Amino acid sequence: FRYNLLYLKKKKRGGVWVDLDMICLNYIDLNEEYIFTQEVDEDNKKSRITTSFLKFSRYSDFGKNLIQEAEKIINKRKKISWGVIGPWFLADHVKKCGLENFVWDYKRTCQIPWCNVKIFLDNTSIDISQPFLHLFSEMWRLNNMEKNTFHQMGVYGQLLKKHEIEKLYNQINTCLKTSMLDNIASFLTKFFIKKL
């Protein structure tokens, strides 16, 4: 899906895919023709390309070849195993096309490794000069970590405070309650008028 989205994007230049659990920490110019990012496991000396943040041009040869190879692997199956056309597949394609110079250091998006997601709730600091931070929400779920709580501590708590998420939540909640009450009142009024 993400490869097709970038390849067929309506803008002349293609687009940028960013996972929904990626937080923008700082503005960064994304005018490079290609962008591939990396992540690490426990060993931060062994980074690898990942699919959480990527960019390539609309109708690019790279995108066309990537999609064609993915379609061969999928072979019209409705279901394939996770990762089959994911990070390793993308990394191999980047290498085959000689695009390694467009690969970002893992710290630009994934400075906290996916396997260390509990750090988000610890009193650990991050490099706030980096442009993005990947939260790896699926790992939160697997580790029974609650995202829907207003944590006061840790990296996640700092981000919630910085972006005033609790205030936003309360405003939305108030609007929803008001809207629901208005809708209920309107419904009841119409209902009783019909009964009369």
For every predicted segment, state its role:
Residues F1-V18:
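A conserved donor-nucleotide-binding helix/loop in the catalytic core
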